[in-house]
């Protein structure tokens, strides 16, 4: 496997998630400051706060008109930011999501697919399954898929007919056919990364080890880069589960994206841990980057 030179793009952050390459810049959410930040990947980072989401930002995406959608985790809303204005409510998902929202992908028609925790992760509550919620361009919403073990990072393949979601507590990437009407069907395992303990006890599941797939990015060869929320590395995975490459920056990595002018810059959201009580009042999170061989593809 190639020896990748890893550099720091941004430091002094609380906990970064939802990295996205859009219109020549890298956008990322900082959980505990509430900031959505845009940075340059070439030369100086030149960070700019483009929105603030007090109830904790996560997944990001863009509507066909160029306005930005931001997941607001704790109040279970999707917000919309138009032309640098204040965030406004695009969809309230509090009746559909049993606990905090997390990552999101937005398709070319402005439909958002949003994951959620399903249970109180940070308090160690019993594990519960959750669903993917589809938010249509007009803000209406419905559950699109159910019974997933912590649906999280999500990508849409270039043909716009396949959606793949990481089941963080299921040790797998799961694929669906994506219909013209936005429906998800034909659920199947895209890649099984590890066996997971058959338990509702979060501590027991974590102690058992294995891969916990989190945020991810698709490349032009159809492989997916996925962050392992338990082990720290970023894995390049082929459909069927073969691991093609592993990058270990020496700290935890919880999300990744491909971007840069040629689409070959792999950006990683890194921190010593994901525990809220360890991250909320510290500023140890990093945005890391390295160059890879195959450029980005699909969405986000």
Identify the meaning behind each predicted range.
Residues 9-23, 53-72, 95-112, 118-119, ...:
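Beta-rich, blade/repeat-based domains predominating
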Residues 41, 176-183, 292-297:
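Short loop/turn segments immediately following beta-strands, especially the blade-tip
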Residues 1-12, 187-188, 290-293, 300:
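A short helix->beta-strand "capping" segment at the edge of beta-propeller domains
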Residues 31-32, 73-74, 119-130, 168-170, ...:
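Short, solvent-exposed loop/turn segments at conserved positions within beta-propeller repeat blades
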Residues 258-300:
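Blade-level signature of beta-propeller repeat domains, shared across WD40, Kelch, NHL, RCC1
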Residues 47-52, 88-92, 142-146, 184-194, ...:
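Beta-propeller fold detector
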Residues 41, 48, 64, 81-84, ...:
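Flexible "stalk/tail and boundary" regions
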Residues 35-37, 77-79, 130-133, 172-174, ...:
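A short loop-to-beta-strand structural motif that recurs across blades of beta-propeller domains
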